[in-house]
């Protein structure tokens, strides 16, 4: 007796374009800026038997947990073919695992990666001093109820930037785009150059924006 086709059903987020943009940014932040140095990037040819998997990006987190973003291709919808890629975002802990939204994933990533305001910045802002740190992952705070201290620091940071020159303002708007450009130039791998200074830390725009996720 012929065995019927078996289906694997998991929650996914549709991605309208190809995954090169996501892969390039991950490799740029891992090998170039070192912001994601601890992250494990697994391309499709190393996944093994899961031929429908385009890539896996594993973010080690605190308390022996990790976040896995798995990209799929060649999926079959109810009719026709799925022309776009999709991703599954899963959070694994010692006791359980669950699928999460991009907003929740941003919060989890920011708990371990990309610097934020330090504890002493509120006192510096009150004294009118220049802030010594800033949040490199502002998108991760959108799903949370921000504290008054955080909102005040964001306003101070924005005012400092507005008083700067035009190059500083353009840098804020196009920071991650330049990162993607550099990533494409280094798509064949980054070779260490002893005479060059390390690149500056990058802002992370958030998963939904990078992947252009369609909810």
From Swiss-Prot:
- Name the GO cellular-component terms: host cell cytoplasm; host cell plasma membrane; membrane; virion component
Q: Where in the cell is it found?
A: Host cytoplasm; Host cell membrane; Virion
Q: Where is the signal peptide?
A: none
**Entry comment, domain topic:** The BC-like-box motif mediates the interaction with elongin BC complex. The HCCH motif (H-x(5)-C-x(18)-C-x(5)-H) mediates the interaction with CUL5.
The miscellaneous annotation reads: Required for replication in 'nonpermissive' cells, including primary T-cells, macrophages and certain T-cell lines, but is dispensable for replication in 'permissive' cell lines, such as 293T cells. In nonpermissive cells, Vif-defective viruses can produce virions, but they fail to complete reverse transcription and cannot successfully infect new cells. Vif-defective viruses show catastrophic failure in reverse transcription due to APOBEC-induced mutations that initiate a DNA base repair pathway and compromise the structural integrity of the ssDNA. In the absence of Vif, the virion is morphologically abnormal.
- GO-annotated biological processes: viral life cycle
Inducing or repressing factors: Expressed late during infection in a Rev-dependent manner.
Instruction: Point to the regions of Basic and acidic residues compositional bias.
Output: 173-189
* Span(s) of short sequence motif BC-box-like motif: 147-156
The segment annotated Multimerization runs over 154-167
PTM entry text: Processed in virion by the viral protease. Highly phosphorylated on serine and threonine residues.
Give the family from UniProt: Belongs to the primate lentivirus group Vif protein family.
Region (Disordered) spans which residues? Answer: 162-203
Keywords from the UniProt entry? AIDS, Host cell membrane, Host cytoplasm, Host membrane, Host-virus interaction, Membrane, Phosphoprotein, Ubl conjugation, Ubl conjugation pathway, Virion
Renumbered ranges of motif HCCH motif: 110-141
- What protein is this chain from? Virion infectivity factor
């Amino acid at each position: 007796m012929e065995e019927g086709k078996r289906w694997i059903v998991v929650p996914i987020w549709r991605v309208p374009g190809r995954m090169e943009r996501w892969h390039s940014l991950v490799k740029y932040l891992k090998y170039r800026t070192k912001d994601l140095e601890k992250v494990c990037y697994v391309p499709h040819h190393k996944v093994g038997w899961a031929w429908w998997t385009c890539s896996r990006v594993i973010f080690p987190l605190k308390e022996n947990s990790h976040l896995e973003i798995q990209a799929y291709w060649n999926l079959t919808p109810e009719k026709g073919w799925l022309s776009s890629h999709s991703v599954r975002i899963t959070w694994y802990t010692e006791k359980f695992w669950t699928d999460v939204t991009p907003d929740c994933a941003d919060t989890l990533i920011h708990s371990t990666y990309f610097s934020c305001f330090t504890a002493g910045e509120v006192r510096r802002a009150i004294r009118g001093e220049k802030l010594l740190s800033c949040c490199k992952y502002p998108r991760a705070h959108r799903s949370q109820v921000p504290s008054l201290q955080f909102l005040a620091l964001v306003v101070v940071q924005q005012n400092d930037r507005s008083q700067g020159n035009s190059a500083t303002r353009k840098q804020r708007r196009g920071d991650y785009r330049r990162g993607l450009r550099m990533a494409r130039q280094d798509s064949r791998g980054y070779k260490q150059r002893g005479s060059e200074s390390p690149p500056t830390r990058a802002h992370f725009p958030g998963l939904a924006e990078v992947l252009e996720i369609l909810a």
